[in-house]
Amino acid sequence: MMYLSTAINVLYKEGLTPCYKIKDSTDPDKWGKVPTKSDDTWNAVTCDWKANGYRLPTDAEWEWAARGGENYKYAGSDDIDDVAWYAKYEYEYDKGTREVKRKKPNGYVLYDMSGNVWEWCWDWWRENIPSDTPAAGVPSGSLRSLRGGSWCNYDNICSVDSRGIKAPSEGGNITGFRVVRSCD
């Protein structure tokens, strides 16, 4: 909870409003212990889309950012070696994450949106997303959407349109996150 409390304090210091609530509170000290497995209370977290604090991107926001205003297969290039850390061969599964900004950025100067680590998105997973889905994504589920692929995936999994899934309680060395803020 120390990290969450520190993050919330930074938000307040910057004059920002926290986006997430658990048990109708933005105070992490009132959220309870971070669960090690699926937990109904933590799975019921809500997001205040009008708040100006940091949050996970939606699936659609992530893809828009990854595309960088361009139409490449990967975030910044059609050649994956320009922009991503990934598994070219089976024996590369043990390479691990890499330092950011060692590859070319995309058109919005965002680095490592293809490969390196899967990035959590706010959305609950749904195989096919209907066109009338709200901007905030699918409202409920048991698995969250991941984007970008990781260092242990082959190139086809690291494209900007590829999606993965994971339970919110799962971690590991192939997942990370990128935060966004809504702008007025």
Question: Where are the model-predicted features located?
Answer:
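Glycine-rich, acidic and aromatic/proline-enriched surface loops and short helix-turn segments
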Residues: 3-10, 67-68, 79, 85-89, ...
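Structured loop/turn residues at beta-strand edges in well-structured enzyme cores
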Residues: 52, 78-81
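Active-site phosphate/pyrophosphate-handling residues
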Residues: 60-63, 84, 178
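Short, well-ordered turn and helix-capping elements at secondary-structure junctions
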Residues: 87, 102-104, 162-165
